[in-house]
């Protein structure tokens, strides 16, 4: 899969590696796309619906005057513990090196070394070939 800039949520999540985006039946279109089918928890996401986010130039949380907010801290902690990925690190890469660098970084770490399929951030194995990571 080729990751695109629109796939990166304001919090730094790469929607292209989300299990909701990757599923075959009723895949989520991604955080930045306002259409169904989108899970209810995504529709009501505090971050994507944040008024302060709309005031940023880039559309990313790292430009917000309240960065990092309590919601982003909580989300980052949960993803670091459960999925070994940090939204703060993702946003830092975007801010310091640009979107192209981040997308190349994501492609490298989200590609199965066994079969080349896209890896989900939410699973410790490849959804295509089953190799444990």
Task: Name every feature range the model reports, one short phrase each.
Residues 26-27, 38-42, 72-73, 120-125:
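Short Cys/His-rich "knuckle" micro-motifs
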Residues 28, 61, 112-115, 126-129:
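Short cysteine-rich clusters marking metal-coordination/redox-active sites
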Residues 19, 32, 46-49, 54, ...:
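Cys/His-coordinated zinc-binding microdomains
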Residues 51-89:
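Mid-chain, well-packed structural core segment of small domains
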Residues 2-9, 18-22, 33-39, 52-55, ...:
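Short, flexible, mixed-charge glycine/proline-rich loop motifs
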Residues 68-71, 86-95, 99-111:
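Extended, acidic-biased charged interface segments
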Residues 2-9, 13-30, 77-78, 82-93:
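Ferredoxin-type iron-sulfur electron-transfer modules and their immediate structural context
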Residues 12-15, 25-28, 42, 47, ...:
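Disulfide-stabilized extracellular ectodomain repeats and their linkers
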């Amino acid at each position: 899969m080729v990751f695109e800039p629109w796939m990166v949520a304001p919090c730094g999540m790469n929607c292209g590696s989300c299990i909701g985006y990757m599923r075959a039946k009723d895949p989520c279109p991604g955080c930045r796309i306002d259409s169904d089918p989108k899970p209810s928890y995504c529709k009501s996401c505090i971050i994507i619906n944040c008024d302060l986010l709309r005031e940023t130039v880039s559309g990313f949380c790292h430009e917000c005057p309240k960065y990092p907010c309590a919601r982003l801290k909580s989300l980052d902690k949960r993803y670091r513990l459960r999925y070994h990925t940090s939204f703060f690190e993702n946003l830092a890469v975007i801010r310091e090196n640009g979107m192209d660098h981040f997308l190349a970084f994501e492609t490298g770490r989200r590609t199965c070394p066994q079969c080349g399929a896209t890896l989900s951030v939410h699973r410790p194995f490849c959804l295509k070939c089953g190799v444990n990571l």
